[in-house]
A protein has these predicted regions:
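Gram-negative host-targeted secretion-system effectors, predominantly Type III and Type IV
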Residues: 1-175
Length: 176
């Protein structure tokens, strides 16, 4: 038995079925298009998997805010825990949908509202005209959600700055 198979079996024994399912949701690609588009193009399974991962991410954001907001301070651990589990892309997608849903809420900063409007979010109405994206709108207090998003955007910018020297180095090596 090689090391990879042994590791997979060990992981399967270590984690509960719920934890294994959660880990799988983290690796699901984001499906940007509405359910009707997915249905027409035979991509309904991808749509559903992405939707479930979005809901799980929303729950993780709510839990992180609840667990890491103390004494009027949102700990950086809140953002790090969600980003570590779901990555920047899904976390930012769920937050963009949340901000767009709360567009008239003054507790969301103008900066975050402008950012959300620039994200590729498609309306996803059901047969009754209700927006399906609301299923993964963050439920935490809008002011705390705004703080969380501000920190996510800051962390994303910092991670891009860290990658910049590496990218420049790779580019110069390619030009040689």
């Amino acid at each position: 038995m090689n090391m990879t198979v042994r590791t997979i079996k060990t992981d399967a024994q270590t984690y509960s079925p719920a934890q294994q399912e959660q880990a799988q949701k983290c690796n699901v690609p984001i499906y940007l298009y509405p359910g009707a588009y997915a249905q027409r193009h035979g991509e309904i399974e991808e749509y559903r998997a992405s939707r479930q991962a979005n809901i799980a991410c929303r729950d993780a954001i709510d839990a992180a805010i609840r667990e890491h907001f103390r004494d009027n301070v949102l700990s950086k651990k809140a953002v790090q825990s969600v980003i570590g589990q779901y990555g920047f892309d899904r976390t930012m997608y769920v937050l963009a949908v949340t901000v767009l849903d709360k567009d008239g809420d003054g507790r969301i900063s103008q900066s975050n509202r402008n950012w959300a409007k620039m994200q590729p979010i498609f309306a996803d109405p059901d047969d009754r005209g209700n927006e399906r994206n609301r299923a993964f709108v963050v439920r935490a207090h809008p002011g705390l959600t705004d703080l969380f998003l501000r920190e996510v955007r800051h962390e994303k910018a910092a991670s891009l700055e860290k990658k910049m020297p590496q990218m420049k180095k790779q580019k110069s090596e390619m030009e040689r």
